[in-house]
Amino acid sequence: MSRPPPTGKMPGAPEAVSGDGAGASRQRKLEALIRDPRSPINVESLLDGLNSLVLDLDFPALRKNKNIDNFLNRYEKIVKKIRGLQMKAEDYDVVKVIGRGAFGEVQLVRHKASQKVYAMKLLSKFEMIKRSDSAFFWEERDIMAFANSPWVVQLFCAFQDDKYLYMVMEYMPGGDLVNLMSNYDVPEKWAKFYTAEVVLALDAIHSMGLIHRDVKPDNMLLDKHGHLKLADFGTCMKMDETGMVHCDTAVGTPDYISPEVLKSQGGDGYYGRECDWWSVGVFLFEMLVGDTPFYADSLVGTYSKIMDHKNSLCFPEDAEISKHAKNLICAFLTDREVRLGRNGVEEIKQHPFFKNDQWNWDNIRETAAPVVPELSSDIDSSNFDDIEDDKGDVETFPIPKAFVGNQLPFIGFTYYRENLLLSDSPSCKENDSIQIRKNEESQEIQKKLYTLEEHLSTEIQAKEELEQKCKSVNTRLEKVAKELEEEIALRKNVESALRQLEREKALLQHKNAEYQRKADHEADKKRNLENDVNSLKDQLEDLKKRNQNSQISTEKVNQLQRQLDETNALLRTESDTAARLRKTQAESSKQIQQLESNNRDLQDKNCLLETAKLKLEKDFINLQSVLESERRDRTHGSEIINDLQGRISGLEEDLKNGKILLTKVEMEKRQLQERFTDLEKEKNNMEIDMTYQLKVIQQSLEQEEAEHKATKARLADKNKIYESIEEAKSEAMKEMEKKLLEERTLKQKVENLLLEAEKRCSILDCDLKQSQQKINELLKQKDVLNEDVRNLTLKIEQETQKRCLTQNDLKMQTQQVNTLKMSEKQLKQENNHLMEMKMSLEKQNAELRKERQDADGQMKELQDQLEAEQYFSTLYKTQVRELKEECEEKTKLCKELQQKKQELQDERDSLAAQLEITLTKADSEQLARSIAEEQYSDLEKEKIMKELEIKEMMARHKQELTEKDTTIASLEETNRTLTSDVANLANEKEELNNKLKDAQEQLSRLKDEEISAAAIKAQFEKQLLTERTLKTQAVNKLAEIMNRKEPVKRGNDTDMRRKEKENRKLHMELKSEREKLTQQMIKYQKELNEMQAQIAEESQIRIELQMTLDSKDSDIEQLRSQLQALHIGLDSSSIGSGPGDAEADDGFPESRLEGWLSLPVRNNTKKFGWVKKYVIVSSKKILFYDSEQDKEQSNPYMVLDIDKLFHVRPVTQTDVYRADAKEIPRIFQILYANEGESKKEQEFPVEPVGEKSNCICHKGHEFIPTLYHFPTNCEACMKPLWHMFKPPPALECRRCHIKCHKDHMDKKEEIIAPCKVYYDISSAKNLLLLANSTEEQQKWVSRLVKKIPKKPPAPDPFARSSPRTSMKIQQNQSIRRPSRQLAANKPS
């Protein structure tokens, strides 16, 4: 073979690498790819590739291949060196483990070199390869590495070894939002802040083209300032061009997953970013309520609720959630087609829920967070849960026999935020040279700056020396000015005190006149009443003469005599009480009408009850259900009446508040007008002061500069010529400067005087404007008064017409009253007869109660004997029937009474309506008169106030004149003192004198202007006086029209008075009848409540007795089985063999089983845990005891019918996925019909304030503590239950909505009636039970399965279809905290 010549080029090599432009550009592109951290072939990826190849090939079986062995021999040592130089886990000290998941854990670490604290996430390569889920970490790494967003947790570096992937992240010491929600009750203000931050964080993720898909409080971390950042991006997915995602698996946490993501499980996975907004809605609901909206104990239950979200989403009644918050949650938790945020984040930002005064969407990150974590050090981990050490062995890859490539999926994972590799490239060198040039230029600039600063410092020193000289002169002037100011302040204080006294005097005089006017008015009223009394006396005498012999006349005389006594008593009282009585009369008539309507409703309902009782005599249970429905109706009617009363009182309060607000608004309007004028004055003063100060500063600066230059020039010349006389010259210069300063002060004072004069001119202008405005207001008032006079004349004409109509109405009323009296007497007799009947029935009832007590005594004595107990139960049933018959008789009597009362009430209603019309007309006349009088008094008060204001203006004017005189005198004195000092500066003195003359001329001009202004002021005062006189004339005219009487015939007046008297008499009779009626109603209501309480107590006693019976049955059954066992033992030949077949392996017979089991407290094991019960299973019943002592006393807590059992089975993780994993093998479930359960009434303790559910159970009620700020009454004692500012503690039942004082419960008073609303009892229930071990669980399940009846239990004749046939199982739910389980398909 021929060799190539030595000088020749290699074949295929580039001809000139340095000279070829195309080759250089390709190399630059290649370098750019290697330097780019996002490139798949960057430096770290290439090193990872080499490292992973060596790790995957370095096994004995693979080294047999010669090529692999040569490769390893070549690169094995260098790869080990690379590993030593790269970052590794040993570079960090582990402080604490703060999280653990399926793929690894999160550690709090400190970097050894920099001593900085980080959170380091470890992911096991073996676990990811084993679960075929090694792709999720790429999205998480890329988002945290390249997001550069304040809403995303930052990744500082990522590295790996043969077992783990490591991600060193920003440490968030505030913990997650789960920790925050467990430590605090989150108010709506906080929820608003954190929801806004989550919205912005998700918007940042969406803007990167990704969907998070696992938004939950566990993935929301808080930094040291309390602000939120998102974490855990393992479930993130890239959106396509249309903003959608295709996925065939449901990804996310069950409680927060959206319906469209759930549907993707079946292969229909096509959804967008709106799935994240669903999770935000769930998160907001959880913050405000304390639980997720679709919580269920099983996964199936949770998913079914999410799919049926339209029906299953509901807000608890006891949670305080605003309308805007509810609206936002509903907008998020809806179908994806209409979900809020589908069209962009802007529509979420514009929602009214986020409106507040503290932050906006741009500065929320800069504002203070609601909770800032208190940290003791940089490694404080108090906001994270303590995690136990993982003692299990770490699994690793097995030694392969062929090439597997376990490390290949992780090539390119390594990342450094501050990458120092390839930093010495040519581009870097160019950057360095540019930096050196910049540094040189900056040094030159700094030198120039230094020289300029030195020059500045010398200039400043010279300026400071001059300022010190000025200060010494200013201090003297300030002392004199202070003394003057003190004297002026004293004088002003004395004058203001005098003005205040004058104002108080004028107001007292006005009040005195007002009281005198009211006294005259009262005297007139008294005279009118005396006239009425005299007329009544005359009528009495006439009646005595006409009807001396008849009995009817004597009754009327007595009534008239009573009326006379009442009117004499009324004369002694004040007129104000009469007006109040009329108002209260109108209000009471309205209340009576309402009570009467209530009584009618109650009568109708009583009729319905009677018919229902007659129909349902066959069965006691059916009778109870009808009674319950009637009670519900009755409570509903009483609630409506209470609501109406509350509304009426609320409206009255609103009227009063409206009037108060009107007066306040008028006062504020006046104050604002005064304030506006004051502000205008201040504005003018400020503008003048500012202009003057600017001028003074400019002039002083110019003068100082000129003087400085002149002094410098003089000093230079004199230093050259006169070196020997420097000291003398310097002293002379100082004196000259002093004199100059004194002259400047004089100049400034003159200019100050000018400014003050200008200020006064502007103040006078403002006063002029004010007075003009007042004149305009007075003219407007005059027009308004004229219109009022016209309106009043029209009203008077209308009132005369109304009087004629009322006279006709009164005639008709007198006829109707006579007929009513007759019917009333008959009704009273019938009512007395019925009351006697009722008393006899009550006596019979008491006798029956005694008999029941005797029967109870017999029951206690005969508890040991079964036959006696059965006999007692039959006896009890007969007593119940007898009580029913008595109840029916009572209801018949009540019905007859109520029918008669209703007829009376209809007649009274018509009379009351007519009376109200007449009273309202009289009230309107009195109101019109009182309004006119009040207007007159207000006008007089305004007059006095304006006179006082004019006096104050005059006083101020005088004060200003005196101040001007004093300033002129002081100026003249200073001028005289200064003339002696300014002898050497004659030229400057002449100039100053000229300026002083000009100033004096200006002062004289100002004085002339002031005189002219005073003249104008006097003219305006005259105009004011004329307007006032016109106003008083108009008021007098109005009073004249009001007091004018129209000529009316005397006969009509007497008829009117007579009818008014009769009207009053009838009204008094009505009032007494109504009082009697209300007393009877209260009495009947109390009796009803007592009956209801008695029925409730008796039903509870019956349940308890039945439970004790069941327990006794089980004891008897046990004794019988023992007896049988003994008989069998005696009959058998082998004495030592024992019962044998009769007993099971565990020592109990097949028909009996007992032991300790745990029940969930309030059906929520996560929040309240379990409670132990002693359980006995007999042939017919399952009995639950609180303790073995209760078992001995036959006092069970709960009893279940074995006939009503449907199903018994061990649970799975999906059934109780919130329970502890260790407890699941020991839990089993019983499914039974609700009618087969009998249970003791439990009084749960009131929960603390921190918890959301504070329900108190009592007599079937579910009371919730509350406060009422609007009118409401207690339905137990009928006393007020509200107050505007400090309402008393109250309770409201969330079933029947009855309201009462909390004191009745605390004092254990028996006033509260039992609840009238009960839940449906014919629905299936499930019960979870926890055994002590898995063996016990299996034993209980196997035994109970044998007990289940083969045929379904016969349904109750009056109940609905059994749940066993419908297979609809209602799962009990309660308030709980959702479990925080780490998802199995991603790290925590």
Curated annotation (Swiss-Prot):
It comes from Sus scrofa (Pig). This is Rho-associated protein kinase 2. It is found in: Cytoplasm; Cell membrane; Nucleus; Cytoplasm, Cytoskeleton, Microtubule organizing center, Centrosome. The active site is at D214. Residues 1-24, 512-532, 1345-1388 are annotated as: Disordered. One of its GO terms (cellular component) is centrosome. GO terms for biological process: actin cytoskeleton organization; aortic valve morphogenesis; cellular response to transforming growth factor beta stimulus; negative regulation of biomineral tissue development; positive regulation of centrosome duplication; positive regulation of protein localization to nucleus; regulation of actin cytoskeleton organization; regulation of circadian rhythm. Activated by RHOA binding. Residues 373-420 are annotated as: Interaction with NPM1. Residues 979-1047 form the RhoBD domain. It holds the Pfam family Pkinase. It catalyses: L-seryl-[protein] + ATP = O-phospho-L-seryl-[protein] + ADP + H(+); L-threonyl-[protein] + ATP = O-phospho-L-threonyl-[protein] + ADP + H(+).
